[in-house]
């Protein structure tokens, strides 16, 4: 029998929707149980529970309010796709204007063409404003010849017939007669590529050849020393001397540079040299430690690229060298023997720029010098040095995220123009640091040109053999080389020679630092690209001076970032590019369109599609795909990723070393580090990259510390050593 007494109890439970929607929130005190359970129940009574959103979506009810917690949680989890209520019912994807997290290894994925700062100060140069000029450093087309300047017939014939030098340049017309007729010290200032090297080599060679009383040979002694700031420039001058000795083999040149074996250099000096080319540090070392180096008969001391010598800190070393030469000089005692040579030491200082530090070096080395500047003897020390008139200087203002694809587009365009032709061209790309050179070299040679050393069966020597002859990321028939100061001297020399002598490739590209910007006469350099801005305006002049040499045409391209860097054009470049129409502002999109506008022959793809992203041949899609391929490669290859991180951090450090006078154009605090990291193919935020660099440096530092040896292993090791010493004590075999 049911014991129901018929009593009914009614409990009034507050409605959640009503309580949440009312202005006056119902507060019910919950007691008993755990704190977490009480908190959950309290929140549910107030309509703030975690499951409220699910309940509303399940029941189809919504209070119409926007909850801050819901919005923040959704934005952190993933982008949402919401329908657009309007004339169209299409769905749009999440906007990548600020990027999004969620990539591999929790990386940050951003779009390539969004949130880019546009150029606000510079206007693109119109075609009607572009002008070209006649070469300013070309050989003089008149009746003047080398023989007419005073060079002997034998050497002049060798220059014109063998070396193909038809006429002397302006600076040669001024320097050669002065060196032949007087014995004054000279300060030579002229444009890069104007023939300064031959202007001082030819008079020295002529004087040594014309010594009649005693014929000059390797046993006669050392008569000339040429100092250069870089090993590459010393090697080049030594090569020019070797070509001159073909008409008179009795004169022997020599070279001493860092990175080579001192023992081999001492052996060559012991045999005897008449003209010695070298870098200051190695030459000073030989003067102090090589007894066979006799400098008592020295007649000429030439300092080439004097501004760079001072910049690299060789001022004290050069002073030491000159003091040693002066102390050991015996010119007065041998005047009667070498009657055709100068009766005093002649000092020459060559420089493309005139700075206070160069003038200071000249005051130390030179004695009452004569100034020769661009073909005229004048005392105008304030004269500005300018770029060659025929050089076309392009300036492209590129957003930081688009730097890498823009460089790729320029190189692709040059290679495509040269493909299928019998002509060849060379391009030099300058970077600010060696880590950046290594990274970009790996990027553009990925899956392309490879070289290996094989043993020749006949000679038994190792030879470098080319395996492939194309670079897929740039174009067929393209070879890429790299050169920087961190490479060994043997690698630097062989790389430079391979780049110069490469006749198989239609387009040869050299990625390098400023080590290749001074004095090198590289043939057929049609284009110079300054991917990273120069540290000084003088560095800019020397960089672009690799092109447009001795009257030839040339093009230089400078990359700048939007913002303060645009002021560099009016503040600095206009001074060294005074010719109207030579300095041109180019839109970076023109390069991207030329490099990434792939033409399709398919009839279906030629038809315009309603969806713009489905069009084939759209340059921005191809550029994005190219860049994403680099990013995926870095995600898959940890070694390449580490190189990219190292290149990025080294680039920032190098950027911070700009001169204080140019800091208003290149301020490291104004860089958008995130966008700049994108140009290195990195998806991590700068903060995360900084932590990874610190952790890697910490790991490297910890690995350098030697671990404490285990006592047991130490005891066993010492026991084995004692046993071995006892067994070997009477072993006389």
From Swiss-Prot:
It is an enzyme of class 3 (hydrolase). Residues 177-372 form the Helicase ATP-binding domain. Residues 52-80 have a biased composition (Basic and acidic residues). InterPro entries: DEAD/DEAH_box_helicase_dom (IPR011545), Helicase_ATP-bd (IPR014001), Helicase_C-like (IPR001650), P-loop_NTPase (IPR027417), RNA_helicase_DEAD_Q_motif (IPR014014), SPB4-like_CTE (IPR025313). Keywords: ATP-binding, Helicase, Hydrolase, Nucleotide-binding, Nucleus, Ribosome biogenesis, RNA-binding, rRNA processing. The Q motif is unique to and characteristic of the DEAD box family of RNA helicases and controls ATP binding and hydrolysis. Disulfide bonds: none annotated. Its EC number is 3.6.4.13. GO terms for cellular component: nucleolus. SMART domains: DEXDc, DUF4217, HELICc. GO terms for molecular function: ATP binding; ATP hydrolysis activity; RNA binding; RNA helicase activity. Belongs to the DEAD box helicase family. DDX31/DBP7 subfamily. The keyword Acetylation does not apply. ATP-binding RNA helicase involved in the biogenesis of 60S ribosomal subunits and is required for the normal formation of 25S and 5.8S rRNAs. The gene is DPB7. ATP binds at residues 190-197. PANTHER family: RNA HELICASE. It catalyses: ATP + H2O = ADP + phosphate + H(+). A motif (Q motif) lies at residues 144-173. Present with 1460 molecules/cell in log phase SD medium. It comes from the Eukaryota. This is ATP-dependent RNA helicase DBP7. It comes from Scheffersomyces stipitis (strain ATCC 58785 / CBS 6054 / NBRC 10063 / NRRL Y-11545) (Yeast).
């Amino acid at each position: 029998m049911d014991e129901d007494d018929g009593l009914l109890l009614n409990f009034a439970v507050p409605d959640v929707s009503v309580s949440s929607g009312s202005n006056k929130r119902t507060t019910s005190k919950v007691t008993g149980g755990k704190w977490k359970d009480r908190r959950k129940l309290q929140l549910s009574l107030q309509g703030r529970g975690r499951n409220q959103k699910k309940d509303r979506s399940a029941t189809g009810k919504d209070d119409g309010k926007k909850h801050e917690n819901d919005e923040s949680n959704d934005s952190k989890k993933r982008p949402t796709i919401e329908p657009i209520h309007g004339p169209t019912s299409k769905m749009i994807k999440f906007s990548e204007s600020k990027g999004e997290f969620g990539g591999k290894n929790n990386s940050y994925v951003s779009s390539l063409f969004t949130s880019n700062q546009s150029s606000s100060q510079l206007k693109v140069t119109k075609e009607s404003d572009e002008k070209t000029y006649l070469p300013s450093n070309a050989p003089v087309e008149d009746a003047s010849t080398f023989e007419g300047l005073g060079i002997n017939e034998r050497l002049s014939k060798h220059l014109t017939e063998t070396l193909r030098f038809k006429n002397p340049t302006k600076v040669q017309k001024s320097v050669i007669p002065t060196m032949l007729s007087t014995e004054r010290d000279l300060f030579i200032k002229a444009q890069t590529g104007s023939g300064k090297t031959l202007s001082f080599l030819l008079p020295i060679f002529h004087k040594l050849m014309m010594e009649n009383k005693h014929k000059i040979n390797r046993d006669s002694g050392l008569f000339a020393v040429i100092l250069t700031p870089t090993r590459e420039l010393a090697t080049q001058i030594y090569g020019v001397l070797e070509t001159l000795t073909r008409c008179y083999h009795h004169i022997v040149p020599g070279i001493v540079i860092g990175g080579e074996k001192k023992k081999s250099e001492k052996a060559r000096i012991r045999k005897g040299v008449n003209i010695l080319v070298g870098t200051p540090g190695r030459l000073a070392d030989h003067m102090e430690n090589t007894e066979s180096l006799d400098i008592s008969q020295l007649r000429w001391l030439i300092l080439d690229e004097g501004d760079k010598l001072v910049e690299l800190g060789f001022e004290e070393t050069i002073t030491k060298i000159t003091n040693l030469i002066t102390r050991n000089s015996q010119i007065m005692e041998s005047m009667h023997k070498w009657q055709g040579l100068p009766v005093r030491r002649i000092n020459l200082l060559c420089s493309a720029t005139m700075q206070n530090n160069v003038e200071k070096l000249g005051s130390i080395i030179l004695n009452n010098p004569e100034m020769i500047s661009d073909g005229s003897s004048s005392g105008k020390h304030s004269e500005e040095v300018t770029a060659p008139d025929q050089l076309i200087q392009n300036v492209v203002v590129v957003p930081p995220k688009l730097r890498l694809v823009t460089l790729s587009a320029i190189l692709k365009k040059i290679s495509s123009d040269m493909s299928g032709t019998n002509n060849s061209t060379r391009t030099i790309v300058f970077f600010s640091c060696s880590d950046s050179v290594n990274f970009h070299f790996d990027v553009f040679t990925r899956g392309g040109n490879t070289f290996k050393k094989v043993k020749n069966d006949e000679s038994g020597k190792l030879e470098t053999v080319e395996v492939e002859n194309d670079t897929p990321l740039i174009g067929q028939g393209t070879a890429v080389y790299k050169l920087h100061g961190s490479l060994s001297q043997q690698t630097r020399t062989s790389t430079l020679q391979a780049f110069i002598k490469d006749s198989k490739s239609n387009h040869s590209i050299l990625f390098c630092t400023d080590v290749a910007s001074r004095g090198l006469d590289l043939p057929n350099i049609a284009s110079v690209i300054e991917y990273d801005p120069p540290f000084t305006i003088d560095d800019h002049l020397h960089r672009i001076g690799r092109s447009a040499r001795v009257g030839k045409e040339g093009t230089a391209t400078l990359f700048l970032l939007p913002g303060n860097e645009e002021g560099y054009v009016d503040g600095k470049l206009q001074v060294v590019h005074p010719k109207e129409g030579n300095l041109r502002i180019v839109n970076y999109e023109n390069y991207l369109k030329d490099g990434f506008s792939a033409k399709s022959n398919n009839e279906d793809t030629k038809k315009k599609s309603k969806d713009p992203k489905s069009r084939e041949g759209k340059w921005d899609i191809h550029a994005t795909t190219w860049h994403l391929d680099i990013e995926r490669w870095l995600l898959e290859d940890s070694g390449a990723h580490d190189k990219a991180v190292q290149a990025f951090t080294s680039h920032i450090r190098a950027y911070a070393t700009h001169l204080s006078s140019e800091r208003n154009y290149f301020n490291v605090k104004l860089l958008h580090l995130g966008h700049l990291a994108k140009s290195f193919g990195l998806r991590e935020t700068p903060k995360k990259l900084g932590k990874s660099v610190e952790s890697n440096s910490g790991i490297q530092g910890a690995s350098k510390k030697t671990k404490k040896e285990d006592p047991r292993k130490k005891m066993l090791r010492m026991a084995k050593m004692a046993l071995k010493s006892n067994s070997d004590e009477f072993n006389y075999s």
